[in-house]
Amino acid sequence: MLTAITGINWGDEGKGRMVDLLSQDYDIVARYQGGDNAGHTVKNERGKFVLNLIPSGILRPDVVCVMGGGMVIDPEHLEKEIAALTEKGVEISPKNLKISDRATITMPFHVAQDGLEEERLSKTGAQFGSTKRGIAYSYGDKFMKKTLRMGDLVHMDASVRKRLETIVESKNLTMVNIYGQQPVSVDEMWAWCERYAKLFAPYVCDVGQFLAEADDAGKKIMFEAQLGALRDIDFGIYPYTSSSNTVSAYAPIGAGIPGRKLTLSIGIMKAYSSCVGEGPFTTELAMTEADKDVLREHGHEYGAATGRPRRVGPFDAVASRYGVQCQGCDELALTLLDVLDYMEEVPVVTAYKLTDGTTTNRFPTGKTLDDAQPVVEMLPGWHCDISGVRKFEDLPAAARNYVTRLEELVGCKIKYISVGPERDACIVRD
């Protein structure tokens, strides 16, 4: 069984929380794209964990976690993440964490270039809101064949050294001539690679073969996405996207088994909207700044990976319907419904008004999206604490009506409803 857990919106939907819950029924959890720009927060009986690179299934002792070839991996960050988890009593070894030999390495110069370019762009207000983790530059060099992969750490021989020399020579053309930096040292980069080769070579393997054999043996495999549909490099709000494919169709590819088909696609959808970074975010126009500040505080809307305040707004049915379509969802998990407990009335963006005066419920692109205005429907609030509810029929009528209205608007059944950050704070509907 191959199941994809993906984001419907801009990211930060609560994927890590749902992966932690649902992985109890799975044997393997595999990340298939992205890097340490992810911030998957999990809160359970063992404490609070923020996972950037390692799949959220790592908190279950019987689950094997896989970092797929579609990922970009910063070994320096991975070392720190493993140390932080180990300090909290989470056991990590090559037995329960496997790293694809095809995964791209995020080198120190990728991180440096990301920060330098964002600083350059910010001088003219053209910045993208990058996390400055080197993600775009890792993927860019991957496609230009000018970086190393995790498999190279297993065979640190003269041929890898020669490739590194060519890579650094090319990178220095940019770092020195465009950004005015000191040239990158080949010797320093080689020493850096040797350090992480000793540390991570035992974890590196052909995860494609591992996953294929597991699938053939009837093992249950879950694919965990990073970010949401609206940040997909092809189907997101370009150029304000990530640099990888976040959609479910890419899950088997990025994980390492491109010829396999998904059995189930579960989309994670937030009960309101949030966004980190630049670009059009129509729903935020539907609330006053004061109301957004209150929502941000109630939802603790600050980036798990960056700490940056997130932009917030009402649930956006136009964007969410598009996200559901992109992810090919069979069912949905609605998260953070409890955050809306304080509202007397709950706004929902049901359509966009365009500059020609017409309205649409289809998600537009380009200039049309830039100029769109939200059309808002107000729904009754429930104005009580629902965090202790575990059955749908025990929710207040207004909360049940909110859930069913969202189902109507996005065209997909909501099976799971999260009413708190704890592992068991979830309603499962038949």
Where are these regions (language model features)?
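Non-transmembrane, aqueous-exposed alpha-helical and coiled segments at domain scale
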Residues: 1-430
